[in-house]
Amino acid sequence: MLKNAVLLACRAPSVHNSQPWRWVAESGSEHTTVHLFVNRHRTVPATDHSGRQAIISCGAVLDHLRIAMTAAHWQANITRFPQPNQPDQLATVEFSPIDHVTAGQRNRAQAILQRRTDRLPFDSPMYWHLFEPALRDAVDKDVAMLDVVSDDQRTRLVVASQLSEVLRRDDPYYHAELEWWTSPFVLAHGVPPDTLASDAERLRVDLGRDFPVRSYQNRRAELADDRSKVLVLSTPSDTRADALRCGEVLSTILLECTMAGMATCTLTHLIESSDSRDIVRGLTRQRGEPQALIRVGIAPPLAAVPAPTPRRPLDSVLQIRQTPEKGRNASDRNARETGWFSPP
């Protein structure tokens, strides 16, 4: 059951589909405890200088695990950053049984399999005036702030998006990293070529990272431009704890949109430089630190559903151990064995 839940959780989005997480499960006769670590070997340093996006990705996978376990009648009790001297250990999760699972909780777990990162143009989301209040209610306001960018402010976001790309234009490490993570020969991670927009398609999407062009298609030609709503997710400050909780809220938003039949695309390139991030911050009335943006809209009804992006095999992301001998802390042992006592 835990293995299936971890497999489902690992459908979480991550920057360039890098999947920068690692799980260690301690299995005993009475209970199982799961530890979440950030895997620094799977970060994208030329894109994500601070490591913020890797932590956000881990927050999303943590919330996905909570949702998957809830659907299996187990409540996840999460302790975040349980070991201050182990900065790469992000959370410890223990489980307690629950008697009743609602249809909504099961649907949320099912939405994990349905969610895609869709980089093509969207039509306007239907009944947004009804959906937006429900979406806001799903967000813990003490953890993150949700702003919806008005149509007349969108041009400022376009400026921020273009500025981000201009600042990276002559960065060979950034472009080499993009080429590697979008290689058509990578099988278990990265961004598959058919999920990227072609030249013709990205001309109709005003907000998006400039990935390498891998195809010459012209999908959704009936949409002359992108009519999505754009959400900004911000946190009270800019700590690692903020980034982790932001990822959990990002998971909530993406799955709520998916359950409502909407398509989504997470945008982080506008946050990767301080100049473009300042523009985004200005659109949120300077309240908090912008962490991610999300395009939300409707894919045309007859449009092909994007194929699921690949994921690493379970034995690459999950290690199961029997409960260690009495008096020895398993997470300390794990850190010593893997050298994860280094500072962040």
Swiss-Prot record:
SS bond partners: none
Upregulation: A member of the dormancy regulon. Induced in response to reduced oxygen tension (hypoxia), low levels of nitric oxide (NO) and carbon monoxide (CO). It is hoped that this regulon will give insight into the latent, or dormant phase of infection.
Basic and acidic residues bias (residue ranges): 323-336
Any single GO CC term annotated in Swiss-Prot or TrEMBL for this entry: plasma membrane
Span list, region Disordered: 304-344
Molecular-function annotations in GO: oxidoreductase activity
PANTHER family assigned: NAD(P)H NITROREDUCTASE RV3131-RELATED, NADPH NITROREDUCTASE
The protein's name: Uncharacterized protein Rv3127
